[in-house]
UniProtKB/Swiss-Prot annotation:
Species for this entry: Pediococcus pentosaceus (strain ATCC 25745 / CCUG 21536 / LMG 10740 / 183-1w)
Obg domain boundaries: 1-158
Localization terms from the record: Cytoplasm
Quaternary structure and interacting proteins, as annotated: Monomer.
GO cellular component: cytoplasm
Protein name as catalogued: GTPase Obg
Length: 430
């Protein structure tokens, strides 16, 4: 089964907790703080594996979690950091944030890596909080939570050449003749339900990868038939061989079909019309094909949009014209840069950071309880060691520094009111 779109959940490892500990040795009465820091949690990394061709491995596994860092230890020893969780994906995988739809990365090169979730840093042990005013602090931090994100992985087949055309025009037959690929072939629509890849090797040592893009129909750009699933793969090719049936055995007019597919390309992505396109009239071994070809060529040359397109008629059965077509395709590929691909429209080329002056929290009164929410305050709370009073006092100072106390007073909170952050409930003190 060819799988080209999946949704997964990834969770990076949490940082290990720092600890409160003191040096206790004979003849060292004032050993001081000795609590070590926690180790860093593992990142979640996507890596291109040249041996993969589909996203099939994700069909039954959708959740991935990296290991957390180890807790700090006595004698100022830092906990062990965890290794990254590396997930293999095929080349041509586009990674999107499922919540925002933003493209996080485009993985095309063998061995290319992308960190999709960063592991949390280790919490600090009490030795980090020692100061002249507080030489023996009982303060430590829990590890920072690792990032968690829902992702959509979308595979776009990487090929130099794409075979384009209506169903049953002979794309699979051509692929089987010029390469060692063995696609399913039959005289009915949508025999090809997945992109098939093959390698074309010329006698002069040149080679290129060719993809049999499943047949398109009118309305494909709106998802009619199997349109969306197929059109995404066209974007990755550098040259399109547009196959047109010259057998005269169908009711459709060859030029009308040719024009319809170009209209679907335009609707799906106008930049696809700038892709180099070679017209390949097929089934030239059948009676009446020569007359159909003459009529078709005349219509093409009369349309200024297609007048400059090269035409290479072939027969995959008799092999007539195949050698010229393959050689010309290789020549055209040499004229087009390797990186001449359509960029994903919303892909970020640089990492940007947004700074906002708005509050990092919200406060809402629910059933006489002041509920505080916000990514920053919740993260600070998770990193607070609630088993030590000094750590709780430090968290209270952080809340005041963020303006939460002032906001509670402004909203009408009174002494003794219940305040909740996540599952932790405490009293508001004036």
């Amino acid at each position: 089964m060819f799988v080209d779109q999946v949704k997964i959940n990834v969770k990076a490892g949490n940082g290990g907790n720092g600890i409160v500990a003191f040096r206790r040795e004979k003849y060292v009465p004032n050993g001081g703080p000795a609590g070590g820091d926690g180790g860093r949690g593992g990142n979640v990394v996507l890596k291109v594996d040249p041996g993969l061709r589909t996203l099939m491995d994700f069909r039954y596994r959708h959740k991935f979690k990296a290991d957390s860092g180890k807790n700090g230890m006595n004698k100022q020893m830092t906990g062990r950091s965890s290794q990254d969780l590396v997930i293999s994906v095929p080349g041509g995988t586009i990674v999107r944030d499922l919540t925002t739809g933003r493209v996080i990365g485009d993985l095309t090169d063998n061995g290319q890596e992308l960190v999709v979730a960063k592991g949390g840093r280790g919490g600090r042990g009490n030795m980090r909080f020692a100061s002249p005013r507080n030489p023996a602090p009982e303060i430590s931090e829990n590890g920072e939570p690792g990032e968690e994100i829902e992702l959509q992985l979308e595979l776009k087949v990487l090929a130099d050449v794409g075979l384009l055309g209506f169903p049953s025009v002979g794309k699979s037959t051509l692929l089987s003749v010029v390469t060692s690929a063995k696609p399913k072939i039959a005289e009915y629509h949508f025999t090809t339900l997945v992109p098939n890849l093959g390698m074309v090797q010329l006698d002069d040592g040149r080679d290129f990868v060719i993809a049999d893009i499943p047949g398109l129909i009118e309305g494909a750009s709106q998802g009619v038939g199997l349109g969306f699933e197929f059109l995404r793969h066209v974007e990755r090719t550098r040259v399109l061989l547009h196959l047109v049936d010259m057998s005269g055995m169908t009711e459709e007019d060859p030029f009308t079909n040719f024009r319809q597919i170009n209209e679907e390309l335009k609707k799906y992505n106008p930049e696809l019309l700038e892709r180099r396109q070679i017209i390949v009239p097929t089934k030239m071994d059948l009676p009446g094909s020569d007359e159909e070809l003459k009529k078709f060529e005349k219509q093409v040359r009369a349309d200024e949009r297609y007048a400059d397109f090269e035409i290479f008629p072939i027969s995959s059965i008799t092999h007539n014209g195949l050698e010229k077509l393959v050689a010309r395709t290789a020549d055209v590929l040499e004229e087009i840069p390797q990186h001449s691909l359509i960029a994903t429209s919303d892909e970020e080329t640089e990492k940007t950071y947004e700074f906002s002056s708005e509050k990092d929290f919200t406060i809402e009164n629910i059933d006489d309880v002041w509920v505080i929410e916000g990514e920053k305050i919740e993260k600070l709370f998770k990193m607070t060691d609630t088993t030590h009073d000094e750590s709780l006092l430090r968290f209270a100072r952080q809340m005041r520094g963020m303006g939460i106390d002032d906001e509670l007073r402004r909203l009408g909170a009174r002494n003794g009111d219940s305040v909740q952050i996540l599952d932790f409930v405490f009293e508001f003190v004036e």
